[in-house]
Amino acid sequence: MMIPTEKIRIRLKAYDHKLLDQSTSEIVETARRTGSAVVGPIPLPTSINKFCVLRSPHVNKKSREQFEMRTHRRLLDILEPTQQTIDLLMKLELSAGVDVEIKLP
C-alpha cells in the first residue's frame, strides 16, 4: 500500500452532534466530488464538563442542581488533495456552531 505524500487533517468540534454530522457530510461530499480520497469521519471521544450549583442562595447545601456541557468531536483526513479540493473547502459555508481546525502536516 502506498503512503500518501500529502494530506489535510480536519478536526471538527460542536456542542450539537446533529450540526456536527451535517457539517462533516458536507466536507466529505465536497472532497469526494473533486476526486480526493477521504478517511473518516472518525468519532473522537465526547468530552463532558459537569457543573454543580446550589439551588438556593443561602441555605440547603444538600439541594443542588447539576448541569453538563458535551463537546462532540470528529476527525477527517483528506488524502492527496487537489487545488480544486482546497479551493472548494475554503469557500464552503458551515454552520456557526461548528469549530473547524485544519492542519496541513
UniProtKB/Swiss-Prot annotation:
InterPro entries: Ribosomal_uS10 (IPR001848), Ribosomal_uS10_CS (IPR018268), Ribosomal_uS10_dom (IPR027486), Ribosomal_uS10_dom_sf (IPR036838). GO terms for molecular function: structural constituent of ribosome; tRNA binding. Disulfide bonds: none annotated. One of its GO terms (biological process) is translation. One of its GO terms (cellular component) is ribonucleoprotein complex. Transmembrane segments: none annotated. Signal peptide: none annotated. Keywords: Ribonucleoprotein, Ribosomal protein. SUPFAM superfamilies: Ribosomal protein S10 (SSF54999). Involved in the binding of tRNA to the ribosomes. Belongs to the universal ribosomal protein uS10 family. Part of the 30S ribosomal subunit. This is Small ribosomal subunit protein uS10. It comes from Desulfotalea psychrophila (strain LSv54 / DSM 12343).
